[in-house]
Amino acid sequence: MRLRNGTVATVLAFITSFLTLSWYTTWQNGKEKVIAYQREFLALKERLRIAEHRISQRSSELSAIVQQFKRVEAETNRSKDPVNKFSDDTLKILKELTSKKSLQVPSIYYHLPHLLQNEGSLQPAVQIGNGRTGVSIVMGIPTVKREVKSYLIETLHSLIDNLYPEEKLDCVIVVFIGETDTDYVNGVVANLEKEFSKEISSGLVEIISPPESYYPDLTNLKETFGDSKERVRWRTKQNLDYCFLMMYAQEKGTYYIQLEDDIIVKQNYFNTIKNFALQLSSEEWMILEFSQLGFIGKMFQAPDLTLIVEFIFMFYKEKPIDWLLDHILWVKVCNPEKDAKHCDRQKANLRIRFRPSLFQHVGLHSSLTGKIQKLTDKDYMKPLLLKIHVNPPAEVSTSLKVYQGHTLEKTYMGEDFFWAITPVAGDYILFKFDKPVNVESYLFHSGNQDHPGDILLNTTVEVLPLKSEGLDISKETKDKRLEDGYFRIGKFENGVAEGMVDPSLNPISAFRLSVIQNSAVWAILNEIHIKKVTN
């Protein structure tokens, strides 16, 4: 009997292990298929972009030919002799082309006309590496000559040493040497080839530098915002460097993350970045931020680089790169007739911050000659005390007394946790959407690892449908209706409130958390996730 029971237990254990392995394999395969589909879709978008670019080029070339024909026609009007050199058909085509005045679409050459003087202006002068493509993440590192100390070798070691073997196959690190001094560039290349020969030969690391003809004349720039002439030149060239690097990197992967040559990284940074991006794959984000400093750790979807590069080229002489990025977001989503808070809420859906920071700035001596910069990311060493989600744009308010600047607005935007002094009956937390939203589910998590006892107690979750009458709802849902039109759909239990929203209540205008009894403790809200219905 014991043997039989042991046999049964062994069989059950085998079946359980087999089912678990099968489930994991199916889940992993599904995840890989999603990534593959995303890459195919992005590749298709990129091919369309290239086709449009080539059409634009052909249009410009045709326009140039038309201008040549016009000059020929002008000459024939002054002298009848050249006319005899052309056939009747050629003369007919000349007249048709010169009689049409097509509008010309502005291009990169409108903002950088000097590029037309040399056909190799947009081709790297130096290009070292295997030309790897099809990766998940491309990391761009611009580097220039520093008077005191270079941090490039240490930065690359930090990035590479914190990658697992399989991750080294799914990314490429592009080092952009933003100098035209051939001796200096060759010296940097030689050092990198000596230090990272294995990584270069495998395709993990690539090195490029621009041709001298890429840069316009930077000697007569207008001084703005109180910056010195040297600083204006430095930031202007920096904008051009970023653009060249982005244009080169765009076709290599799904995402592009901007780094600097004087940083260190956290362990498991690559997997964290990739998973965070996949988690937000259904959201219309434009920038994911993995550091709060300047342009460090800013990640973009590869197709968006076209818009970003074009925008920077339009204003590369006017402002620094981080200001220009903010202007792009403003142009895309901000309403001039609304206030600054509304604009910030809209931009927060395109610019999503991950905490804690994954990159830390370590360079003391700036690439701007004579500048000392003691910049460090204060979020780099912090533990994660809140969970970040992308929520629908909303105006938030509360009757609770906020403690030490831990506001509800920051929590809703994923910047901080909300901390309030002892709630009493009648207190509320309100999320009023900018426009009604079809909501699938909700999750509110109170307390955190530092203060696990500061949770919401005796608090209910309520929603306000857009329609106050004529709802096709069940008797059970109808009984949850309150006098002010809200419906009570859940409550906090052990500091957590989560559940599904009855589809018949959609679209929803607002969510409200209502305190129904006095609390004996303070309250922290560290996770808010109002999940929209996916199409």
Swiss-Prot record:
Glycosylation, residue list: 77, 458
Pathway: Protein modification; protein glycosylation
Gene Ontology cellular-component terms listed: endoplasmic reticulum; endoplasmic reticulum-Golgi intermediate compartment; extracellular region; Golgi membrane; Golgi stack; peroxisome
pH sensitivity of activity: Optimum pH is 7.3.
EC number: 2.4.1.145
Membrane topology summary: Single-pass type II membrane protein
Catalytic activity: N(4)-{beta-D-GlcNAc-(1->2)-alpha-D-Man-(1->3)-[beta-D-GlcNAc-(1->2)-alpha-D-Man-(1->6)]-beta-D-Man-(1->4)-beta-D-GlcNAc-(1->4)-beta-D-GlcNAc}-L-asparaginyl-[protein] + UDP-N-acetyl-alpha-D-glucosamine = N(4)-{beta-D-GlcNAc-(1->2)-[beta-D-GlcNAc-(1->4)]-alpha-D-Man-(1->3)-[beta-D-GlcNAc-(1->2)-alpha-D-Man-(1->6)]-beta-D-Man-(1->4)-beta-D-GlcNAc-(1->4)-beta-D-GlcNAc}-L-asparaginyl-[protein] + UDP + H(+); an N(4)-{beta-D-GlcNAc-(1->2)-alpha-D-Man-(1->3)-[alpha-D-Man-(1->6)]-beta-D-Man-(1->4)-beta-D-GlcNAc-(1->4)-beta-D-GlcNAc}-L-asparaginyl-[protein] + UDP-N-acetyl-alpha-D-glucosamine = an N(4)-{beta-D-GlcNAc-(1->2)-[beta-D-GlcNAc-(1->4)]-alpha-D-Man-(1->3)-[alpha-D-Man-(1->6)]-beta-D-Man-(1->4)-beta-D-GlcNAc-(1->4)-beta-D-GlcNAc}-L-asparaginyl-[protein] + UDP + H(+); an N(4)-{beta-D-GlcNAc-(1->2)-alpha-D-Man-(1->3)-[beta-D-GlcNAc-(1->2)-[beta-D-GlcNAc-(1->6)]-alpha-D-Man-(1->6)]-beta-D-Man-(1->4)-beta-D-GlcNAc-(1->4)-beta-D-GlcNAc}-L-asparaginyl-[protein] + UDP-N-acetyl-alpha-D-glucosamine = an N(4)-{beta-D-GlcNAc-(1->2)-[beta-D-GlcNAc-(1->4)]-alpha-D-Man-(1->3)-[beta-D-GlcNAc-(1->2)-[beta-D-GlcNAc-(1->6)]-alpha-D-Man-(1->6)]-beta-D-Man-(1->4)-beta-D-GlcNAc-(1->4)-beta-D-GlcNAc}-L-asparaginyl-[protein] + UDP + H(+); an N(4)-{beta-D-GlcNAc-(1->2)-alpha-D-Man-(1->3)-[beta-D-GlcNAc-(1->2)-alpha-D-Man-(1->6)]-beta-D-Man-(1->4)-beta-D-GlcNAc-(1->4)-[alpha-L-Fuc-(1->6)]-beta-D-GlcNAc}-L-asparaginyl-[protein] + UDP-N-acetyl-alpha-D-glucosamine = N(4)-{beta-D-GlcNAc-(1->2)-[beta-D-GlcNAc-(1->4)]-alpha-D-Man-(1->3)-[beta-D-GlcNAc-(1->2)-alpha-D-Man-(1->6)]-beta-D-Man-(1->4)-beta-D-GlcNAc-(1->4)-[alpha-L-Fuc-(1->6)]-beta-D-GlcNAc}-asparaginyl-[protein] + UDP + H(+)
GO biological process: glyoxylate metabolic process; N-glycan processing; protein N-linked glycosylation
Tissue expression pattern: Highly expressed in small intestine, kidney, lung and spleen. Weakly expressed in brain, heart and liver.
Phosphoserine modified-residue sites: 474
Cofactor: a divalent metal cation
Post-translation changes: N-glycosylated.
GO molecular function, one term: metal ion binding
Superkingdom of origin: Eukaryota
Keyword Membrane: yes
Membrane-crossing segments per the record: 7-27
Location relative to the cell: Golgi apparatus membrane
Keyword terms: Coiled coil, Glycoprotein, Glycosyltransferase, Golgi apparatus, Membrane, Metal-binding, Phosphoprotein, Secreted, Signal-anchor, Transferase, Transmembrane, Transmembrane helix
Major location category of this protein: Golgi
PANTHER family: ALPHA-1,3-MANNOSYL-GLYCOPROTEIN 4-BETA-N-ACETYLGLUCOSAMINYLTRANSFERASE A, N-ACETYLGLUCOSAMINYLTRANSFERASE VI
Entry similarity comment: Belongs to the glycosyltransferase 54 family.
Protein known as: Alpha-1,3-mannosyl-glycoprotein 4-beta-N-acetylglucosaminyltransferase A
Native organism taxonomy: Eukaryota, Metazoa, Chordata, Craniata, Vertebrata
